[in-house]
Amino acid sequence: MSNIYTSADQLIGKTPLLELTHIEKELQLKARILAKLESFNPAGSVKDRIAKKMIDDAEAAGQLKPGSVIIEPTSGNTGIGLASVAAARGYRIIIVMPETMSVERRQLMKAYGAELVLTEGAKGMKGAIAKADELAKEIPNSFVPGQFVNPSNPKAHIETTGPEIYEDTDGKVDYFVAGVGTGGTVTGVGQYLKRKVPSVKVVAVEPASSPVLSQGVAGAHKIQGIGAGFVPDVLDTKVYDEIIPVSNEDAFADGRLVGRKEGVLVGISSGAALHAAVELAKRPENEGKTIVVLFPDTGDRYLSTPLFAD
């Protein structure tokens, strides 16, 4: 039977779960760590899911029509995902991002035909959001998906990522671990899994040098994609049972470990999530348990960063 797709956005989702057997052995872990490899999405990250869902829902609501311009503030992967879906649907797209994001991310967005507007690095995501709102007022027929406030973001994970994890593990999942950027992933997957497996524990990962969720303090950090510096509207702060802060150095080290031990290149935030998952796996009470950790993207968009500097 033929199995042919007619648009790249039909390829989003159904990403594989990989047990990190070599890392389990190397670190003598007695729990299983299963990594959800979101780099298998067509534009290379978990953000493809929310890009498609936000555009689908905006089209259904009449907010996006032929000739509309999509404007989005993003630290990178959402911009790449939106640029890909916009290209597949024929929309013009403008991405607003802090100048501190990796050069690969900028090049990728441009490769999909997106226009880029860079904002002052020191102002972080707040500066990018303010600039996007300003552009939206100036440009007619524009639409700002607003990943930090758009309920379609967590909904994408309630409808796709959560069910995929549940089905692929036959419901045998004890922990779900994910970094918090917009909070959409941890919220959507967490809500879905807790409905299906009430005993599951959800663990949020944030940068140790910007512990907004655990201590209410924002700061500079190098873990691109998580730690926005504020508590996003779409984040359900009641869904997670624990917050694990991870240092830049540990995120880099564990990100490198995946490539060298498992043969899969992952990004910095995947390294942070793995560090938290390993911390859980080392606890004696978690022997024999299954920990699902979400790896948001691939490492090839971080070749210019300290992740692969040595």
Name each region found by the language model:
Residues 1-310:
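PLP-dependent amino-acid enzyme catalytic core
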